[in-house]
Amino acid sequence: MLRVLGLGDNVVDKYMHTHTMYPGGNALNFAVYAKMFGIEAGYLGVFGDDEAAIHVYNTAHELRLDLSHCRFHTGENGYAEVRLDDGDRVFIGSNKGGVSKKYPLGLTKMDREYLAGFDIVHTSIFSYVEDMLPFVRDAAGFVSMDFSDCVDDAYLRRCLPFIDCASISCGDMSRNEILNQIEQIREYGCRHIVIATRGSKGALVSVDGTLYEQSPCLVAATDTMGAGDSFITCFLINYVDAMKDARDFPVVSGDRGITGCKN
């Protein structure tokens, strides 16, 4: 059975207009969504000791994620402040990861052995694991990273040589700009898969240099929080599972689109 790990960020998303907080974070969301698809999933990250940390940890535990290698520190858990504009989530503030930034992950020998037991390790630009990427690359069979809307040249050059799948958010970019960005990412070292999500315009995915496109299934969204994470999760678990069986990606995608899930 496929096994996946979210490595890095966990936060609470504080909806300021409703005074409600929800568990989140790219790495944690990946693990949770995979678990919802019936995949064996774990999460490795840093928790604080405040109410937000307790809420996130308890939720992840209730969902039966493997949390056996997580770290715990005194301090404020990561949080993001959010508002909704016509169903589109807008980030208006954060504490930049809280304890995750103050006490970044340092992978031990036991951690590296742990990573080797997973088919996919997914992390993000918000996880403060850049220094650990060479070790993650050595330990894990398949490494994925969400770069959000980052176009910083130095940062991309630093991280991409260790990544099998890079995800970027391109909702405000033109098609030509996206294609150029995909090629740049490939030139900087991530030559296998690049996922470019475009919100209501669908997604572009480059697999070994071949470009695929998926049109969106348009809905009246009430909240777009986690939409990109769920797309990335669905794509990766279907892609890697198919490749383990040596099936061809174009055949696998078929009428299900590039995520492998029916619209």
Regions found by a protein language model. Give the residues of each.
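Conserved phosphate-binding/catalytic region of the ribokinase-like
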Residues: 179-263
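Conserved N-terminal subdomain of the carbohydrate kinase-like
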Residues: 12-17, 21, 39-120
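Histidine-anchored nucleotide/phosphate-binding helix
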Residues: 27-36
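General beta-strand structural signal in soluble alpha/beta enzymes
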Residues: 6, 69, 123, 145, ...
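Active-site metal-binding loops of divalent metal-dependent hydrolases
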Residues: 9-10, 230
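Conserved beta-alpha-beta core of the PfkB/ribokinase-like small-molecule kinase fold
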Residues: 120-184, 201-202
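Extreme N-terminal starter segment of soluble prokaryotic enzymes
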Residues: 1-5
